């Protein structure tokens, strides 16, 4: 049996291939073009021996009558330690011009999620060294975290800082999936990892903005498969995805090309199922854990858009980046009132941390309520208690800013890693009134509270 078919139709990235009736490929089987390295993935069986496929590469130059071979298996990618320090594409082929990967084993990119009885929950905290995150939306080891934000508020910079801090402190293996993002960012990221000497612990999988929708749709699964392989070996892995929205967008493009009727806002009707299929696999089992940090672009800053709204339900912690906070020059521009975490529970993080975080949020919420009154009547019309609340809230707001290691080139000030104990001590002091006599500018862009006191001396 030849397992060969011929192309009968090409519409952009969608290719219809005809096989003899007894040899029709299964859905998700990989087909390879004769005489080229182009791979097609079967998406639908149309009947009469015709299958509809999506091209994982450029379909330029394809024409009817060209021959295609059915590999009779799914797309499989290299896994294991040989992938570390390498940049690969959606098919696991090296794109860093450093020779073959030479991995001992391959794994198919489509797999079932672990069974319910294999899952394990974790309450161990993952310290990030970023004050605002550690205080109001702490991460769990083996949890799923989303970084939500519109265009240009700092998702990728926050992601890079988290990778730098956690990869250095955590010293485990990481997998980074660049899904439909800018090639420049992928290049910056590679060099950032190289300069931080953590490249030999990171596997990089890129499917950039300029690539066909098939590549962008599958590259997240390629990265996830590599992370799952490390987890199944009994390791604790970090899995970074930048950007989940582009994964959804690629699904929308593929869905339209396959002729499905769009649903709300033009998204694919299978949005929730596709998201669930990816997210359910990003989980910790009894053998090892996957801690996942995902950047999620929010179209037009609208958190109710179907794409970010579908992602919310799968996450343990959500870090919401706000344009209003970024416009004040406070970076990281995390909104402490919008960001949430399931770990913010006194039984997990302890009474001291919990009470400090809640008091910080209460103070900021009070300031938010008073802002309209201040804008209309001015500060003088407030009661002494409210004036004190506003003063403390402004100090908290500035103390939530922090210089990043990955942004040293732009800011000119050295990055700071703040341990959790220091963070709690600083904010506890502000809300209890310990630092009421210190000017608010001393709290801006510093690490721990000791730095604030030193800065205050130089100001006074």
UniProtKB/Swiss-Prot annotation:
It comes from the Bacteria. It is an enzyme of class 7 (translocase). Keywords: ATP synthesis, ATP-binding, Cell inner membrane, Cell membrane, CF(1), Hydrogen ion transport, Ion transport, Membrane, Nucleotide-binding, Translocase, Transport. It holds the Pfam family ATP-synt_VA_C. Coiled coil: none annotated. It is found in: Cell inner membrane. GO terms for molecular function: ATP binding; ATP hydrolysis activity; proton-transporting ATP synthase activity, rotational mechanism. HAMAP family: ATP_synth_beta_bact (MF_01347). F-type ATPases have 2 components, CF(1) - the catalytic core - and CF(0) - the membrane proton channel. CF(1) has five subunits: alpha(3), beta(3), gamma(1), delta(1), epsilon(1). CF(0) has three main subunits: a(1), b(2) and c(9-12). The alpha and beta chains form an alternating ring which encloses part of the gamma chain. CF(1) is attached to CF(0) by a central stalk formed by the gamma and epsilon chains, while a peripheral stalk is formed by the delta and b chains. This is ATP synthase subunit beta. It comes from Nitrosomonas europaea (strain ATCC 19718 / CIP 103999 / KCTC 2705 / NBRC 14298).
């Amino acid at each position: 049996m030849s397992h060969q078919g011929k192309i009968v139709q090409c519409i952009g990235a969608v290719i219809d291939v005809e096989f003899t009736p007894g040899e029709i490929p299964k859905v998700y089987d990989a087909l390879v073009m004769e005489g080229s390295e182009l791979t097609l993935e079967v998406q639908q069986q149309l009947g009469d021996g015709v299958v509809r496929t999506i091209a994982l590469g450029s379909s330029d130059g394809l024409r009817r009558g060209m021959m295609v071979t059915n590999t009779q298996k799914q797309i499989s990618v290299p896994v294991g330690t040989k992938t570390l320090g390498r940049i690969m594409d959606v098919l696991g082929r090296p794109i860093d011009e450093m020779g073959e990967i030479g991995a001992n084993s391959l794994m198919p990119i489509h797999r079932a999620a672990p069974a319910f009885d294999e899952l394990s929950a974790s309450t161990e905290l993952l310290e990030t060294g970023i004050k605002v995150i550690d205080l109001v939306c702490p991460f769990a080891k083996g949890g799923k975290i989303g970084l939500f934000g519109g265009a240009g508020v700092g998702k990728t910079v926050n992601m890079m800082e988290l990778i730098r801090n956690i990869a250095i402190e955590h010293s485990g293996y990481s997998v980074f999936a660049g899904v439909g993002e800018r090639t420049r960012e992928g290049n910056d990221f590679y060099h950032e990892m190289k300069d931080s000497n953590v490249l030999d612990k990171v596997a990089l999988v890129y499917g950039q903005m300029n690539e066909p929708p098939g590549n962008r749709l599958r590259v997240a699964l390629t990265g996830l498969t590599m992370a799952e392989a490390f987890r199944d070996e009994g390791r604790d892995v970090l899995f970074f995805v930048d950007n989940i929205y582009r994964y959804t967008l690629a699904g929308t493009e593929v869905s339209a090309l396959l002729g499905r009727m769009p649903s709300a806002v033009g998204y694919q009707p299978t949005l929730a199922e596709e998201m669930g299929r990816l997210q359910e696999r990003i989980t910790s089992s009894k053998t090892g854990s996957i801690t996942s940090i995902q950047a999620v672009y929010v179209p037009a800053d609208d958190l109710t858009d179907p794409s970010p709204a579908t992602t919310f339900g799968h996450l343990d912690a959500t870090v919401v980046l706000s344009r209003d906070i970024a416009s004040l020059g406070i970076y990281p521009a995390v909104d402490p009132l919008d960001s949430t975490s399931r770990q913010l529970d006194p039984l997990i993080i302890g009474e001291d941390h919990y009470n400090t975080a809640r008091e910080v949020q209460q103070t900021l919420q009070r300031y938010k309520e008073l802002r309209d009154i201040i804008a209309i009547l001015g500060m003088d019309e407030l009661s002494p208690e409210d004036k004190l609340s506003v003063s403390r809230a402004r100090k908290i707001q500035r103390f939530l800013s922090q210089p990043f290691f990955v942004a040293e080139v732009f800011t000119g000030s050295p990055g700071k890693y703040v341990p959790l104990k220091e963070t709690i001590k600083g904010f506890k002091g502000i809300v209890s009134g310990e630092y009421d006599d210190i000017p608010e500018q001393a709290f801006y862009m510093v690490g721990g509270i000791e730095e604030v006191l030193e800065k205050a001396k130089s100001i006074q």
